[in-house]
Amino acid sequence: LVRDGVAQVVRLARQFAPYCTEVLVSANLNLPHYAEYGLHAHADRVAGIGPIGGLEVLANACTSTWLLTVSVDVLQLPDTLLPRLAQAGGEGAVSCDDDGLQPLVALYRVDALRPALAAALAVQQHSVRQMQAVLGLPHVLFSGAHFGNLNTPEDLHQAGCSDADSAAHRG
């Protein structure tokens, strides 16, 4: 996914680079493509289970204490995202914007996340929201913010994504 000539994953990685020691990407296609940007891509270890599969592979690849997850199809995130989620304390936090809960934009303490994911997957529970509830993650409201979404052709066009750019860089 490319917006205004910049890969969306690179755009997001740059935004959070000051806070991160490494950027991990959950992707099931074109993994070598991400290395061109200095990113480490990982395919789901359990196929076909949705976003929790990506979260599981990232949690197991993560070498730091904390894991910030951001969906690549968000339009924009506030620069205060990570500091505000971190202030919630505990095992992490989940973001909410004016459109509601954003379960794929969250911060996790990795040593709590790994066993929670293992327990959820052991009973075929594939809901990220449910796993977050089991962890007791608080919701942090970003009032006045709309993270947006890049799912439909209209969303992509309005965000500056060309059809050629988007088709060439999916994965």
Predicted regions and their residues:
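Nucleotide and nucleotide-moiety/phosphate-recognizing core
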Residues: 1-128, 133-147, 154-156
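SAM-dependent methyltransferases
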Residues: 157-171
